[in-house]
């Protein structure tokens, strides 16, 4: 017997009992973004590898270790997208939709791919909802993105579980001055750095600030501080952001070691973190990337955005038991029919109900079965009500209306009154 083929490690099936929560989360985010005037964009999941090398940075863990890269039949190097920002910028440039200073407020949702060690809430195929804004340079739009996420946490009941961390990376010139000071400080202590940090010292020294190695973190306590090297424009931008968050009543923590894992960030960077999921605590992160559009061949264009991890936020909702009870219900109403004539009538009645009550979740029993077995299936579906149609009901042009979640006698309802009566029951 041949061995069953299984899913690739770190790439998981999302089963029917899980998808209602995913849909609830995605619908909550989409509705909120629509309300703020953001428009959806959809990009391909495969891009030329060069896009990510130029945007993310060649000397990053993502490009060096984690990308799924392959050569196609034409000899082109292609990569499954590891994140969405670079693809979105490529699309905006390719189609010219940010030219002439046009403001674009965009969002997307879909799978991303990174070959890293699978762990709780972290997978090799994972899903993100991303938001990107082009041609707005001020701290007001940075604040809007954070206010928007704060509102989302409120809608989902997660505000008490997340903390906002902020930092400013300053201008590229300010970072260059700081980089020199940091390299000088760490070079004198090179032997005490962990292996990854030693490698990064010559290629991407700011990423050392993000090291998880305890000895390296101890060395950084007395290292030069990025805040001391900020240019005046970045300083004012950061103060403007903090002032707006204060007015909005959003608490935050300044984290001077927050640098983000991608090379294109500058000025504002932020993360929403939680301590409810163990070590992998970031659920949403972003910042400003004013130089990326030009870096990818466009004109200088201010830009800012964020991405949130769907798996981690779904896991957080489950961990904190913030899952709405109705999500366990497959349908609102289950139609039981006994006998061929009743089955035919039930089909017609069900379609009339769907016409009369848009949005009604109604399942008609398939596969026949006894009264007891059909009611058992109705109960298992989570339906609030069962409709019962047998020979007697058919003869009298009535339907039995039975509550599955409350005590009470089955009611007989005429076919013409069924839609109105059912609507009243579901509103109650």
Swiss-Prot record:
It comes from Azotobacter vinelandii (strain DJ / ATCC BAA-1303). It comes from the Bacteria. Belongs to the class-II aminoacyl-tRNA synthetase family. Keywords: Aminoacyl-tRNA synthetase, ATP-binding, Cytoplasm, Ligase, Nucleotide-binding, Protein biosynthesis. GO terms for cellular component: cytoplasm. One of its GO terms (biological process) is histidyl-tRNA aminoacylation. PANTHER family: HISTIDINE--TRNA LIGASE, MITOCHONDRIAL-RELATED, HISTIDYL-TRNA SYNTHETASE. This is Histidine--tRNA ligase.
């Amino acid at each position: 017997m041949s061995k069953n083929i299984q899913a690739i490690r770190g790439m998981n099936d999302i089963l029917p009992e899980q998808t209602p929560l995913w849909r609830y989360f995605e619908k909550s985010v989409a509705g909120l973004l629509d309300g703020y005037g953001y428009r959806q964009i959809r990009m391909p999941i495969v891009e030329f590898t060069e896009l990510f090398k130029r945007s993310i940075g060649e000397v990053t863990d993502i490009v060096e270790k984690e990308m799924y890269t392959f050569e196609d039949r034409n000899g082109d190097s292609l990569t499954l997208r590891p994140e969405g920002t670079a693809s979105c910028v490529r699309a905006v440039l390719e189609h010219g939709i940010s030219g002439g200073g046009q403001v674009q407020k965009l969002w997307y949702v879909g799978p991303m791919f990174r070959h890293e060690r699978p762990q709780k809430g972290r997978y090799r195929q994972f899903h993100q909802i991303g938001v990107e804004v082009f041609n707005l340079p001020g701290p007001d739009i940075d604040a809007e993105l954070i206010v928007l996420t704060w509102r989302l946490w409120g809608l989902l009941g997660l505000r008490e579980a997340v903390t906002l961390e902020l930092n400013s990376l300053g201008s590229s010139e300010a970072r260059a001055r700081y980089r020199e000071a940091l390299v000088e400080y760490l070079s004198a202590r090179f032997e005490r750095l962990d292996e990854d940090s030693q490698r990064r010292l010559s290629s991407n020294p700011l990423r050392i600030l993000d090291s998880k190695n305890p000895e390296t973190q101890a060395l950084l306590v007395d290292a030069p501080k990025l805040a001391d090297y900020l240019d005046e424009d970045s300083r004012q931008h950061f103060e403007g952001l903090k002032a707006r968050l204060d007015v909005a009543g959003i608490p935050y923590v300044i984290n001077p070691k927050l640098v983000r894992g991608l090379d294109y960030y500058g000025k504002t960077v932020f993360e929403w973190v939680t301590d409810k999921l163990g070590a992998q605590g970031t659920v949403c992160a972003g910042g400003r990337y004013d130089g990326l559009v030009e870096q990818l061949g466009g004109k200088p264009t201010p830009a800012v955005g964020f991405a949130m991890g769907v798996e981690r936020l779904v896991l957080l909702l489950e961990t904190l038991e913030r899952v709405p009870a109705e999500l366990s219900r497959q349908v609102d109403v289950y139609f039981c029919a006994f006998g061929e004539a009743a089955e035919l009538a039930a089909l017609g009645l069900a379609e009339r109900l769907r016409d009369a009550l848009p949005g009604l979740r109604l399942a008609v029993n398939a596969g026949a079965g006894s009264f007891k077995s059909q009611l058992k299936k109705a109960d298992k579906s989570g339906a609030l009500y069962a409709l019962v149609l047998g020979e007697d009901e058919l003869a009298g042009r009535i339907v039995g209306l039975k509550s599955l979640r409350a005590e009470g006698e089955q009611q007989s309802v005429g076919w013409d009154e069924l839609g109105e009566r059912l609507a009243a029951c579901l509103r109650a």
